[in-house]
Amino acid sequence: MLYGLKITDWDKICFVPSHNLKDGGEKTASTLKVGDKVLLKTSLGIDLAEVVSINSEESFSCETGSKQEAVILRKATKEDIRKDDYLNQKKKIKQAIKESARYVKELNLPMKIIDAHFSFDGGRVTIFFTAPERIDFRELVKALSSHFHKSIRLYQVGVRQVFELEGDIGPCGYPLCCRCFLRDFDKVSIKAAVEQNLAHRGMERLTGVCGRLKCCLLFEQNKKGNQNKDEN
């Protein structure tokens, strides 16, 4: 079996095979279910993670996540969950974002800090950010490491993913599709608009609140493509 695990909402799903459960793994595996919390050991350290899926290895898709050399140490206890909640309490996260943003401003980097997460083992802080392009943030890592006295992991989040998690109302007047039901975020090109005879509407009407081409362009294109296949 493959256990799909997420440490934070921003992280991609990490798939861990059942044989990567520590001592007593068979007993743990038989009791794990979606929604449970576990202690996960990776090359970065130890984190509290949530089981978001349980599937057979044959159903694994590299598009939804990645297999990692990680070990599920055990099912999390109430004390483990309380500890993680304490480490990542809103007040502490808000302060971490504020301090990180201050260093970003001092270094004049074109990036926006959107979230932070403290690892369960206390040795690492993950800083989540958005940016229009790739950035050399080596000086920022040094500054943050000195400030927090911990290892720093910087994680760039796509603009679409931000709106997927935070939600908003689309130009159509309905909640964003990415927030409600879309789970696969393939690249959307202007070709999708051309093939649906929508290119003449102009980029302003084809762009979503995230500033990218609307996901529904690709969704509708794929939907029509599947309908044509069924008719044939």
Predicted segments, located by residue:
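Acidic-enriched and Gly/Ser
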Residues: M1-A193, L198-H200
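Iron-sulfur (Fe-S) cluster-binding segments and ferredoxin-like electron-carrier domains
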Residues: C177-Q196, G202-T207, L213-E231
